[in-house]
Curated annotation (Swiss-Prot):
<feature type="binding site">
    <location>
        <position position="194"/>
    </location>
    <ligand>
        <name>Fe cation</name>
    </ligand>
</feature>
<comment type="similarity">
    <text>Belongs to the iron/ascorbate-dependent oxidoreductase family.</text>
</comment>
<dbReference type="InterPro" id="IPR027443">
    <property type="entry name" value="IPNS-like_sf"/>
</dbReference>
<feature type="binding site">
    <location>
        <position position="264"/>
    </location>
    <ligand>
        <name>2-oxoglutarate</name>
    </ligand>
</feature>
<keyword id="KW-0560">Oxidoreductase</keyword>
<dbReference type="Pfam" id="PF14226">
    <property type="entry name" value="DIOX_N"/>
</dbReference>
<dbReference type="GO" id="GO:0051213">
    <property type="term" value="F:dioxygenase activity"/>
</dbReference>
<feature type="region of interest" description="Disordered">
    <location>
        <begin position="77"/>
        <end position="97"/>
    </location>
</feature>
<protein>
    <recommendedName>
        <fullName>2-oxoglutarate-dependent dioxygenase frbH</fullName>
        <ecNumber>1.14.-.-</ecNumber>
    </recommendedName>
</protein>
<dbReference type="InterPro" id="IPR026992">
    <property type="entry name" value="DIOX_N"/>
</dbReference>
<keyword id="KW-0223">Dioxygenase</keyword>
<comment type="function">
    <text>2-oxoglutarate-dependent dioxygenase; part of the gene cluster that mediates the biosynthesis of the antifungal antibiotic FR901469, an inhibitor of beta-1,3-glucansynthase, exerting antifungal activity against the pathogenes Candida albicans and Aspergillus fumigatus. FR901469 is a cyclic depsipeptide containing 12 amino acid residues and a fatty acid chain. The NRPS frbI contains 12 modules responsible for the formation of the depsipeptide backbone which is denoted as Acyl-Thr-Ala-Tyr-Val-4OHPro-Thr-Thr-3OHPro-threo3OHGln-Gly-Thr-Orn-OH (C71H116N14O23).</text>
</comment>
<feature type="binding site">
    <location>
        <position position="196"/>
    </location>
    <ligand>
        <name>Fe cation</name>
    </ligand>
</feature>
<dbReference type="InterPro" id="IPR044861">
    <property type="entry name" value="IPNS-like_FE2OG_OXY"/>
</dbReference>
<keyword id="KW-0479">Metal-binding</keyword>
<keyword id="KW-0408">Iron</keyword>
<dbReference type="GO" id="GO:0046872">
    <property type="term" value="F:metal ion binding"/>
</dbReference>
Length: 321
């Protein structure tokens, strides 16, 4: 890391997966503080050989898939926010007057579990790999929720995991992103600033580009990839369920060197609450988890001026800076 990169890097704490799995009390308190102060943290996965191998397997799949022609990938399009292919430039980008510049392949957890007919052909063809990855990412994020519930001594009805029952439908989704190499900037840029919709995001990426809006010092800071580590962040739902104790940090994706000089790949598992879970959202509104999801995706596609007119895009967090 260069001296300038070090200056521009966000400080995030690093937690150990194996210590959280074993319900280590000290690690649990570090987890609570990370969620309260930063809303982001690194999770060291190197104790879990299977998860590291699955990461490599999904990256290999992405390298093959995203190199297909656009016509071939569009066969997987489902015009959905939770499954299928989505081409570049469908939402507002990270800079004024430009759209986003990423493409994605998504797989809904519920539909993968049931092998739904809605699954994109590319997901069906790689069902075993993607199903296992989703199982493991889901297990890790649910374990984190349980540790937070223990730390806060929540009663059964208020435990965070109680809003994520296996028997209930949810919009939890695996999303595989490619930010294509760019020759010119005017085609689009990055991924616009936002807070995540759901409860927790489990992110795997080996390349720079993710930025978090820091409170001290105020400004955008790059999240440096660490070998063998996931980046975990708090989403709006966990912020709402915690009574705003936990922080859903504003973040974006933007090229480090103005243009995206090489393809950038990232894998995100978005843990989301069951669809009918009731949330006390921004402005004192009461909404279901599904309605918050749908409303926020609608805002992603609006103009920058329309996005600035309410607090949905950044979950009200930008006002707290």
């Amino acid at each position: 890391m260069s001296q300038q990169e070090a200056v521009d890097a966000a400080f995030l704490p690093t937690l150990d997966l194996s210590r959280l799995v074993s319900s280590d009390a000290e690690e649990r308190q570090k987890l609570v503080r990370a969620c309260e102060v930063y809303g982001f943290f690194y999770l060291d996965l190197r104790s879990d050989a299977e998860l590291i191998a699955l990461w490599t397997g999904v990256l290999d799949l992405m390298g093959q898939y995203f190199n297909l022609s656009l016509d071939e990938k569009m066969r997987d399009s489902r015009n959905s926010d939770t499954h299928g292919y989505e081409p570049v430039a469908t939402s507002t980008g990270a800079q004024d007057d430009l759209p986003d510049y990423y493409e994605s392949l998504k797989a809904s957890r519920d539909e993968v579990l049931t092998q739904s007919s809605k699954l994109a052909p590319a997901v069906k063809a790689n069902h075993a790999l993607l199903n296992r990855f989703i199982e493991r990412a889901h297990a890790v994020t649910m374990m984190i929720l349980r540790q937070l519930s223990i730390a806060l001594e929540l009663d059964d009805s208020h435990k965070f995991e109680a809003f994520h029952r296996h028997s209930e439908e949810s919009l939890s989704t695996l999303s595989m992103f490619r930010y294509p190499k760019q020759e010119v900037l005017d085609v689009g840029v990055g991924h616009n600033k936002h807070t995540d919709i759901g409860t927790l995001t489990f992110l795997l990426c080996q390349q720079q580009g993710l930025q978090v809006l820091s409170k001290d010092p105020v400004g955008w800071r790059f999240v440096q990839p660490l070998p063998g580590c996931a980046v975990i962040n708090v989403g709006d739902t966990l912020r709402f369920l915690s009574g705003s104790r936990f922080r859903s940090a504003v973040h974006r994706v933007i090229p480090v060197d103005q243009l995206q000089r090489q393809d950038r790949f990232s894998i995100a598992y978005f843990l989301r609450a069951e669809n009918n879970a009731t949330l006390n959202a921004v402005g004192g509104r009461t909404v279901s988890a599904k309605d918050w999801h749908d409303e926020k995706f609608d805002v992603f596609r609006k103009s920058r001026e329309a996005q600035a007119s309410d607090d949905v895009l950044t979950g009200g967090m930008e006002r707290d800076m």
